[in-house]
Amino acid sequence: MLLLVGVGCEMAQCARRGGGLHSPMGRKGVRLGGVKTYPIEIGGVRRDLPVVQVGPGVAVALLNLLGDTELVEAVAAELAKRLPSEVETLVTPEVKAVPLAHALSRITKKPYVVARKTEKPYMINPVSRTVISITTGKPQLLVLDGADVALIKGKKVAVVDDVVSTGSTLKGLRELIEDVGGQMVAVMAVFTEGSPREDVIALGHLPLFEPE
């Protein structure tokens, strides 16, 4: 079985995103040790995502790839099958999707670039954009080091992220990529979240939850 999420996209939408299954659990999730969780399975790897409140009246199933090598490798293997052949470079926002971009780069042999959250003293002619994060609700800086421009300029680029929700990060990344002469031709993610997005190659869909 490729992918199981607690509630998935409709079957036609899943097919467009690369396939998937869903269970009748809906937005309720389950409780483990008193913590509300949302079950997922990708490439035979199962996880229970904690449901956490991120704003007034809004909670999300929190996917954390950091330190989870087994899940990262399973996700990368599935996304690699769906990477458009025209893609030449991968770009990912710091920080949670960095392990995924690294694993996907290793499998596909495509170089990857990390858009940092802050400007660093060693950066050469950095290019930046400010977006609003759905997780924190606060402005977030996206910065490309000028030293990475050669990997993007004149290239067809795929953005790699863990979860795509409002699209504010994507908008900022698209502007950064275009500013340095690249072309964003694909967006790849583990999950979309909230409203379904047909413009994202994802392995499944996560709903938003109402805090208890």
Regions found by a protein language model. Give the residues of each.
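Active-site-facing substrate-recognition patch
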Residues: 20, 26-87
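Short Gly/Thr/Asp-enriched flexible loops that form oxyanion-binding sites at enzyme active sites
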Residues: 99-108, 174
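Short glycine-rich phosphate-binding loop at a beta-alpha junction
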Residues: 88-94
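Acidic, divalent-metal-coordinating active-site segment for phosphoryl/phosphodiester hydrolysis
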Residues: 161-174
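N-terminal amphipathic/basic-hydrophobic helices that include classical n-h-c signal peptides
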Residues: 1-31
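Short, glycine/charge-rich flexible loops or terminal/linker lids adjacent to PRPP-binding catalytic cores
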Residues: 110-157
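PRPP-dependent phosphoribosyltransferase catalytic core
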Residues: 26-32, 40, 171-212
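Conserved acidic residues
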Residues: 88, 155, 185
